[in-house]
A protein has these predicted regions:
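Conserved acidic segment of CheY-like receiver
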Residues: 30-42, 47-51, 79
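Short hydrophobic/Thr-rich beta-strand motif most characteristic of the beta2 strand and flanking loop
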Residues: 55-62, 70
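Active-site beta3 strand of CheY-like receiver
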Residues: 74-80, 85
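Acidic catalytic/metal-coordinating carboxylates
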Residues: 62-66, 89-92
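The short loop immediately C-terminal to the conserved phospho-acceptor aspartate in CheY-like receiver
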Residues: 40, 57, 83-84, 111
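Short, Lys/Arg-enriched segments at the junction into DNA-binding effector domains
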Residues: 30-33, 144-202, 206
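Positively charged, aromatic-enriched patches within helix-turn-helix-type DNA-binding elements
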Residues: 174, 179-186, 190-244, 249-251
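Basic, amphipathic DNA-recognition helix from helix-turn-helix-like DNA-binding domains
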Residues: 89, 95, 99, 104-161
């Protein structure tokens, strides 16, 4: 058990998480979402406290199935993944993630054998930290993973895309129309973001489903019709005659500026 981490977390922040103000916890610029996957409540609590107080948004999952579902629904920026999960091995979770996303994954495990580390890294992990761990070291590795993830996903084009009907700020994850912010659900944003990042290009239906919903949804094409209709109602001047969110019959979808 990682008593050093737990004791440090509870001593520094004893049951005071709700007292931390938004101004104290918010980072400058877009917030970073971290998915913590671990079935040990004390580890999860320590990570939640230490990450939240530094401005990270934290979501948690106690099983492999819950982790894959959370990743598909919430699109975290980084995943901290334990290998010893109750329903499946963490390597299986890693394989599931790598089937559709390249988000940075830091393995946090009690397995110390070099063979376990090699297996995880070969399966697509970006880093490997063993338990018990020092919080300062983990935070440094997390910052490095965030930097690598940002560099990998950086688009050489302007991250602000302006159309005649609405504006999409990819870096800030915001959409405005007629000067007002448009509220999008996480799934709506995920679909719009992928289309905008591939603007002018056809995005296939299976590719879009895998990226936004996850690999197990690759045949659920009706999801695309429903969510594209919602996006058109929110963003297009004339949803029945869209100019920017276009359907390529039988193939996929295209974003046109």
């Amino acid at each position: 058990m990682t008593t050093t981490v737990i004791e440090r977390a509870t001593a520094q922040y004893p049951e005071r998480r709700s007292e931390v103000s938004m101004t104290e916890t918010k980072q400058d610029g877009p917030s970073i979402t971290v998915l913590v996957v671990d079935d040990e409540p004390q580890i999860v609590r320590a990570l939640r406290i230490n990450l939240s107080v530094r401005g990270y948004e934290v979501i948690t999952a106690g099983s492999g199935a819950a982790a894959l579902r959370a990743a598909a629904e919430r699109h975290p920026d980084v995943v901290i993944l334990d290998l010893g999960l109750p329903d499946m091995d963490g390597i299986e979770v890693l394989a599931g993630l790598r089937g559709w996303t390249e988000i940075p994954v830091i393995v946090l495990s009690a397995r110390t054998d070099s063979a376990d580390k090699v297996e995880a890294l070969d399966a697509g992990a970006d880093d490997y930290v063993t338990k018990p761990f020092g919080m300062d070291e983990l935070l440094a590795r997390l910052r490095a993973a965030v930097r690598r993830g940002a560099a990998a996903s950086a688009d050489s084009d302007d991250p602000v895309v302006v159309t005649s009907s609405f504006t999409v700020d990819l870096a800030a994850k915001k959409v405005t129309k007629d000067g007002a912010a448009v509220h999008l659900t996480p799934t709506e944003w995920g679909m719009l973001e992928m289309l905008v990042r591939h603007r002018g290009k056809l995005v296939g239906r299976k590719e879009l489903l895998r990226e936004v919903w996850g690999p197990s949804y690759a045949t659920e094409t009706h999801y695309l019709r429903v969510y594209l209709a919602q996006l058109r109602r929110k963003l297009e001047d004339d949803p029945s005659h869209p100019k920017h969110l276009l359907t390529e019959a039988g193939m996929g979808y295209r974003f046109q500026e």
